[in-house]
Amino acid sequence: MTMHNSVEFQDAFDVIVVGAGHSGCEAALATARLGCRTLLLTLNLDKIAWQPCNPAVGGPAKSQLTHEVDALGGEIGKMADRTYLQKRILNSSRGPAVWALRAQTDKREYAAIMKNIVENQENLSIRESMVTDLVLGANDEVIGVETYFGVAFQCKAVILTTGTFLGGKIWVGNKSMPAGRAGEFAAEGLTETLNRLGFETGRLKTGTPARVDKRSVDYSKMQLQPGDAEVRWFSFDPDVWVEREQLPCHMTRTTPETHRLIRENLHLSPVYGGWVEAKGPRYCPSIEDKIVRFVDKESHQIFIEPEGRDIPELYIQGFSTGLPENLQLQMLRSLPGLENCVMLRPAYAVEYDYLPATQCYPTLMTKKIAGLFCAGQVNGTTGYEEAAAQGIVAGINAARFVRDEEMIVFPREHSYLGTLVDDLCTKDLREPYRMLTSRSEYRLLLRSDNADQRLTPLGREIGLIDDRRWQMFTRKQEQITGEKERLYATRVKENDDVGKAIASNTQQAIKGSITLADLLRRPGFHYVDLDRYGLGNPELTPAEKEGAEIDIKYSGYLARQQSQIEQIARQAQRQLPGDLDYTTVDTLSKEAREKLNKVKPLTIGQAARIGGVNPADINALLIYLELRQSKHQKGLAVLP
């Protein structure tokens, strides 16, 4: 760290953002749009908003985060809607709480468009530089940054969004080199600065699979994975939607030969060879981790996904590895359809420094240094969507800090974004954190479809939602409210022609009459059915129809979830048996069983605060304890 009295500043800004990945871009755009003079510093101006791993946005829980960032006025959802190669709704056969939109994106187009956006944003300057030091004022508040080559910039707030670049080292087998990503040098000096300031730092690991030439692949041996015929959107702003031709993805599977090659060469991987001890992401394991952890699985799904419309590279999803390069090609060629593949880039593992986010307030400002914020992978998360969500939170609060306004804490009951930040700042997490729907006890309330209803009023209050977006939002909510009133008030009689048709086609009688709302509550009956019988409202958009239907159809479930939340709160002081073997509680997630058995919490409240133990696990544990107690009272053998 450098003290203020020994520094000559080249220029002055309100906010400086260090790192121009998905977190840094959201943070910088937010502060600039809120009127702060902002400087965005990056190691490479040509890699702004780069997608170094899977070029995709969305998926379970991640799509909810993307919708929420958009609802606040952020950019990631718009980018995915403009640059997608394919879109699919995952979990569509289940309830709307777990519906997940996923877009395969064109990585070069995505980066080029985001670069153009940040380059042309008012109040935002971008520059290539490596930040190595923070400049502190007389009261240990941040007042600037210093670069590797000795240039200093003054500011009132700094947002660190350094990704995997702090002390980054990439591994292929037992070979390593300093790098944040393949071909890009690591950031030096900043970790040491943070350590000198008293911050705890740790090491984490992630990895990315090889890329192969699409012209060397035989798709006829793979299963086609087309996009959805009906395209859905991340952004609530129809003006940014771009209808475009979709490209197919494909699926293949590992073979006994794949597994043999990996098992016989495990000792050559960075982790199993003992050269890397950093924890990797539990929910995105390397292929060697899968073979070791799931011994009884004969085969694993591998998805073959295009990286762009006009480039030959294919991303081999589910096949990340740190094994030696010469072995990687043998492994790839053991997959059906890839027998003659040409490898364009090898897979590699990367380890990097991170700051456990318990050192931050829920505003994402650090507790030790006023004006210093951290967001994204440096906080121990994994994923572009998690990074973008933290970026907009840090950007909003840095702007408010600069203006001496009260900073905003996003409550976990209002958003996945709030759940994410709350988990990071309160739980001692020692492995990369990925957002999951099970991490939220409010997931029925926190759906993709109502992210605007939950967060756009706040985005408007903050200053990120303009008049046009606000008018669109208020009209949509008025339409949904009015339609719900109509559905509750309008009745169909059993002797009407339409009533007879509905009873006949659904094999469910109508006794006397029924409201349209009660029809929608019937299993298998949807708004499209109302349209079919001429009972729908043709003036509504698909999103408005869906919003009204979900609110009505799931009203009972929403009330039940609220009751469960209140029950967990009441049970916080409930004692847990000291002899309880959590490995035998099958209704707990595997991660929860591991963590609970290790910590042996004394109460339900303590169990709920353990990293990796989700609200769904706590609910399952309460049910298990009730069953255990019930059996004990009946004099039956106690459950194990």
UniProtKB/Swiss-Prot annotation:
<protein>
    <recommendedName>
        <fullName>tRNA uridine 5-carboxymethylaminomethyl modification enzyme MnmG</fullName>
    </recommendedName>
</protein>
<dbReference type="Pfam" id="PF01134">
    <property type="entry name" value="GIDA"/>
</dbReference>
<dbReference type="GO" id="GO:0050660">
    <property type="term" value="F:flavin adenine dinucleotide binding"/>
</dbReference>
<dbReference type="InterPro" id="IPR044920">
    <property type="entry name" value="MnmG_C_subdom_sf"/>
</dbReference>
<dbReference type="InterPro" id="IPR026904">
    <property type="entry name" value="MnmG_C"/>
</dbReference>
<comment type="similarity">
    <text>Belongs to the MnmG family.</text>
</comment>
<dbReference type="GO" id="GO:0005737">
    <property type="term" value="C:cytoplasm"/>
</dbReference>
<comment type="function">
    <text>NAD-binding protein involved in the addition of a carboxymethylaminomethyl (cmnm) group at the wobble position (U34) of certain tRNAs, forming tRNA-cmnm(5)s(2)U34.</text>
</comment>
<dbReference type="GO" id="GO:0002098">
    <property type="term" value="P:tRNA wobble uridine modification"/>
</dbReference>
<dbReference type="GO" id="GO:0030488">
    <property type="term" value="P:tRNA methylation"/>
</dbReference>
<dbReference type="InterPro" id="IPR020595">
    <property type="entry name" value="MnmG-rel_CS"/>
</dbReference>
<dbReference type="InterPro" id="IPR036188">
    <property type="entry name" value="FAD/NAD-bd_sf"/>
</dbReference>
<dbReference type="InterPro" id="IPR002218">
    <property type="entry name" value="MnmG-rel"/>
</dbReference>
<feature type="binding site">
    <location>
        <begin position="280"/>
        <end position="294"/>
    </location>
    <ligand>
        <name>NAD(+)</name>
    </ligand>
</feature>
<dbReference type="Pfam" id="PF21680">
    <property type="entry name" value="GIDA_C_1st"/>
</dbReference>
<keyword id="KW-0285">Flavoprotein</keyword>
<dbReference type="InterPro" id="IPR004416">
    <property type="entry name" value="MnmG"/>
</dbReference>
<dbReference type="Pfam" id="PF13932">
    <property type="entry name" value="SAM_GIDA_C"/>
</dbReference>
<keyword id="KW-0819">tRNA processing</keyword>
<dbReference type="InterPro" id="IPR049312">
    <property type="entry name" value="GIDA_C_N"/>
</dbReference>
<keyword id="KW-0963">Cytoplasm</keyword>
<comment type="subunit">
    <text>Homodimer. Heterotetramer of two MnmE and two MnmG subunits.</text>
</comment>
<keyword id="KW-0520">NAD</keyword>
<dbReference type="InterPro" id="IPR047001">
    <property type="entry name" value="MnmG_C_subdom"/>
</dbReference>
<feature type="binding site">
    <location>
        <begin position="19"/>
        <end position="24"/>
    </location>
    <ligand>
        <name>FAD</name>
    </ligand>
</feature>
<dbReference type="InterPro" id="IPR040131">
    <property type="entry name" value="MnmG_N"/>
</dbReference>
<keyword id="KW-0274">FAD</keyword>
